[in-house]
């Protein structure tokens, strides 16, 4: 069993140099809870090495005293110095009124608590969260695909979300458009979305534009964002977005759903050797060839799955993580629970980027 030391006694001994206080908490815990200036972070050092270098007793402290007690018990017999566990860990230290300083961070205490699980990911951390805070995304459509995308972008701390939609909330939307509620029927979707997202995360900027994208409006919407997420439901809008993304060199995340299936793809028009959306669909289908959701129906959860996958790709791209869907389309069959990727080749005859 680990030898215990009270936080007050550990503090007294550390102040006079009788004890070396080692903080086992990770960066996420420190950012969320606070810094103990007289404690050293263990960081990446092996504990046996630290003990071998010590000339005085060592006390280990974690968030609640559990992890540190286990390490003390495991290392006590082989330790060349006296090894103690700070009883109750950081929480007992703080409860005793001992000194705790605010961490040096660009995030407020509330934000550090909110994004704790991001800070715990080495691939994201504070630096990645700053990237998200500084990023801006255009979300076209606050419907079935746009609902999960908007919610998860806001929850992730995306700094600025621009939502474009000219529709109003209808009761038939609520089977799949989880951004809206019964009380919002008749409201503009952008207003309903803005209220919901501000309630979810008041620290981000939500910009709304109650309009239908056209040739006279699309460039202004695309030019001042980092990434475009297409949650529209028609080919003319997708072609407009693709052309604008080509002009302004913005990545485009496309998605579509029908009945029990969906697909999504990431295009970076303008990049050497990369296809655009129109390489995939050179011409719009004729009238009645591709029914919309109102005609064919859609299982309510499908837009949630596809829209969430869109958001995953968006966050990966903004953070520079993993392998993206760039130049590919992911096809999801909900009934068979199958996922397959199709690589899209640049089309030299493409009416948009072929020249």
What kind of region is each of these model predictions?
Residues 8-17:
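A short acidic-Thr-Gly-centered motif at the start of a beta-strand
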Residues 1-9, 85:
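N-terminal intrinsically disordered, low-complexity tails enriched in polar/charged
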Residues 82-92:
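Non-catalytic regulatory/accessory regions that flank a structured catalytic core
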Residues 1-3, 18-20, 24-33, 40-57, ...:
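Adenine nucleotide-associated cytosolic modules
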């Amino acid at each position: 069993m680990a030898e215990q030391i009270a936080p007050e006694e550990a503090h007294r001994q550390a102040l006079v140099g009788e004890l070396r206080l080692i903080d086992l908490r990770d960066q996420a815990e420190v950012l969320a809870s606070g810094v103990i200036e007289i404690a050293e972070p263990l960081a990446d050092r092996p504990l046996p090495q630290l003990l071998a270098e010590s000339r005085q007793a060592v006390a280990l402290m974690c968030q609640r005293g559990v992890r540190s007690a286990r390490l003390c018990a495991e290392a006590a017999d082989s330790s060349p110095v006296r090894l103690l566990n700070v009883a109750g860990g950081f929480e007992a230290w703080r409860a005793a009124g001992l000194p705790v300083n605010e961490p040096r961070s660009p995030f407020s205490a509330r934000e550090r608590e909110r994004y704790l699980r991001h800070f715990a990911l080495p691939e994201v951390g504070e630096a990645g969260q700053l990237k998200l805070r500084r990023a801006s995304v255009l979300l076209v459509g606050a419907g079935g695909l746009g609902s999960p995308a908007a919610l998860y972008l806001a929850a992730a701390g995306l700094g600025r979300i621009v939502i474009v939609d000219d529709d109003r909330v209808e009761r038939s939307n609520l089977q799949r458009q989880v951004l809206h509620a019964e009380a919002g029927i008749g409201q503009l979707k952008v207003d309903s979305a803005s209220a919901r997202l501000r309630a979810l995360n008041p620290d981000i900027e939500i910009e709304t534009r109650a309009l239908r994208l056209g040739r006279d409006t699309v460039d202004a919407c695309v030019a001042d964002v980092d990434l475009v997420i297409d949650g529209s439901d028609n080919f003319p809008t997708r072609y407009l977005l693709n052309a604008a993304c080509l002009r302004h060199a913005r990545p485009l995340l496309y998605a579509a759903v029908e009945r029990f299936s969906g697909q999504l793809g990431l295009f970076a028009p303008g990049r050497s050797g990369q296809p655009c959306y129109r390489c995939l669909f050179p011409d719009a289908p004729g009238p009645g060839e591709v029914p919309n959701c109102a005609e064919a129906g859609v299982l309510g959860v499908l837009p949630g799955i596809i829209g969430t996958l869109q958001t995953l790709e968006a966050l990966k791209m903004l953070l520079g993580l993993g392998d993206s869907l760039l130049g590919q389309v992911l096809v999801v069959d909900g009934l068979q629970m199958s996922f397959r990727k199709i690589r899209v080749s640049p089309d030299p005859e493409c009416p948009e980027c072929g020249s």
